[in-house]
């Protein structure tokens, strides 16, 4: 492991992890809203938002899958040192990190009827986040919200699987938004 892996974590772990957790949970509770998130300084190509999200949610009991662009020694070492999370295949992952075109959504766990919570959460690195584009409705949204999603049909199909399905966290720079499986997309 190189010394760069030791850097870039939370400098004030209790405060930063609590603030980051709140940002991620707010994003999940209010689909379509974009929140600022910071704390981590991960190696490229991980954004501040994705790195901070991983430091907040991943631990030694949660398998993380890295897509091709992120599956680099520096990233693996950094993630392992700061979270202890095992690096796993897509079929075993609780969390996955990647660009949209690299995430094979068919490969990840959708949960079961007995345990719908045993599904994967995909952390999708986006070029930008904006409250425009797809229309979102459902829990946590007063009337409707908007978010630039990479592909509307897939999110509609994912919603049809509810209570099974994938959850999505979108990151760009130091900003985060989310799309839980319960959200209707049009």
Where are these regions (language model features)?
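N-terminal, charge-rich interaction modules
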Residues: 1-63, 67-70, 81, 174-175, ...
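Internal, well-folded beta-alpha domain core
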Residues: 61-62, 73-186
